């Protein structure tokens, strides 16, 4: 028997394996264009999540940047500054 999915999954779609097989191309297009993951439920196996490669790479990069506690602290501090309108705009070096 498959696992029970949480009642509320914000910003996620869910489809059965059968529907996913029938509408694979459309689901892949939606996942890539909307950047909203889709859960594919299976009767006797654990569910899987389909996300775009772009979103996966973004998650991996975020995890990498937050791995270092010092780097994570600096990033969180910078985010707070931006949220409080204390950010400084700078030109990028090429």
From Swiss-Prot:
InterPro entries listed in its UniProt record: Antitoxin_Phd/YefM, phD/YefM_antitoxin, YefM-like_sf
GO terms for MF: DNA-binding transcription factor activity; sequence-specific DNA binding
SUPFAM superfamilies: YefM-like
Pfam name, any one: PhdYeFM_antitox
Alphabetical list of Gene3D superfamilies matching this protein: 1.10.1220.170, YefM-like domain
Single Gene Ontology BP annotation: regulation of DNA-templated transcription
Family of this protein: Belongs to the phD/YefM antitoxin family.
Name of protein: Uncharacterized protein ssr0761
Organism: Synechocystis sp. (strain ATCC 27184 / PCC 6803 / Kazusa)
């Amino acid at each position: 028997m498959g696992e029970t999915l949480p009642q509320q999954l914000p910003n996620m779609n869910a489809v059965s394996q059968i529907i996913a097989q029938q509408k694979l191309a459309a689901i892949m297009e939606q996942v890539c264009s909307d950047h909203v993951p889709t859960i594919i439920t299976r009767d006797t196996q654990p569910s899987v999540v389909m996300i775009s490669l772009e979103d996966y790479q973004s998650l991996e990069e975020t995890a990498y940047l937050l791995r270092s506690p010092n780097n994570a602290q600096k990033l969180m501090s910078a985010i707070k500054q931006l949220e409080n309108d204390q950010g400084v705009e700078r030109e990028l070096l090429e």
